[in-house]
């Protein structure tokens, strides 16, 4: 797990997300506390529980983006889910325990990837031997093998096509037992059963020598790794370092005066309670305790309020962070300052057609103004509004770019207003088009 300081985490998030200092600080402290807990010993380590977070803020201000960037930073198993995807246990649909099963799968992939790095050198040599077997046969003399090995290492054989046998890891469907909630633990995974019975299934693939290396290195790495050890390590990592991000939590809050329980509302909240508090979930790899998994939840709370959540669930989300709506200055900074800003993306896309785009300062002001106006008059969708506006402005250039190779387009305020001004003024039209 990464041991960035809170200040480093915030500055890393600043590269991609504008504003929202409070939310960044909250997740940075939460992430650092995971590392601090790892440094403790014995009983105290068991007692320290993560402080779960509830992010509240309008759509398009960076709630989900903060979680995505945090996952990359953490180097820890991370799963993002929408609360609306789940139904109460006993109904058709996914139950909330599936979140933890997904987390374990992600942890296994993470641990396997790390372990593969440790055995990469040995796996590379084994892969080379298998390529030689495919080129000259297993019975070839050592002299022949050596001469081909030299050619291989010089890259002379890169384009030659060979047939290789690799283990077949194609996902075969799990049998699900109707009427049994949680039966999709993977009770009877037929490929596992067949694989063990027949000593591992393989399939033949045709590929060039150059392309065969990554496939064979992965295959050989897996042979060198102890799969049981990987699973045990992944279960430990899931329990100690796992982060679960639950989006749209406001959509499962019962609205005041609303009637009907709603299969995917209060029931889902009740099912989430033990998960967030700490329980043991059965997975096909073994039981996973959720006591030390960090839960970050977020919601826009346009219609409902955080107090509409079950009181017990509110109590289990002790850290509340409010994200502010974006201002005109924020829109300007989103267009220019972020690492892969929209303007940089469009310039890069057009360069593939040998078309040069230049944006003047007043164009950026105009784009920000239009986005703010539309958010105020139509519907506030935050930073996502910029994508709509940019697409509309660059529609003509994007369409004709292949015929205009070598051309340079300078986009200024006049151009922006010409393309979008009329629509922005006519509120009825902009409701449909922007």
From Swiss-Prot:
Gene Ontology CC, one term: HslUV protease complex
Subcellular location: Cytoplasm
Keywords: ATP-binding, Chaperone, Cytoplasm, Nucleotide-binding, Stress response
Gene Ontology molecular function, alphabetical: ATP binding; ATP hydrolysis activity; peptidase activity; proteasome-activating activity
Predominant localisation class: cytoplasm
SMART domains for the chain: AAA, ClpB_D2-small
Highest taxon of the lineage: Bacteria
Biological function: ATPase subunit of a proteasome-like degradation complex; this subunit has chaperone activity. The binding of ATP and its subsequent hydrolysis by HslU are essential for unfolding of protein substrates subsequently hydrolyzed by HslV. HslU recognizes the N-terminal part of its protein substrates and unfolds these before they are guided to HslV for hydrolysis.
NCBIfam families: hslU (TIGR00390), PRK05201.1 (NF003544)
Oligomeric and partner information: A double ring-shaped homohexamer of HslV is capped on each side by a ring-shaped HslU homohexamer. The assembly of the HslU/HslV complex is dependent on binding of ATP.
Protein's name in the database: ATP-dependent protease ATPase subunit HslU
Species assigned in the record: Brucella melitensis biotype 2 (strain ATCC 23457)
Taxonomic lineage from the root: Bacteria, Pseudomonadati, Pseudomonadota, Alphaproteobacteria, Hyphomicrobiales
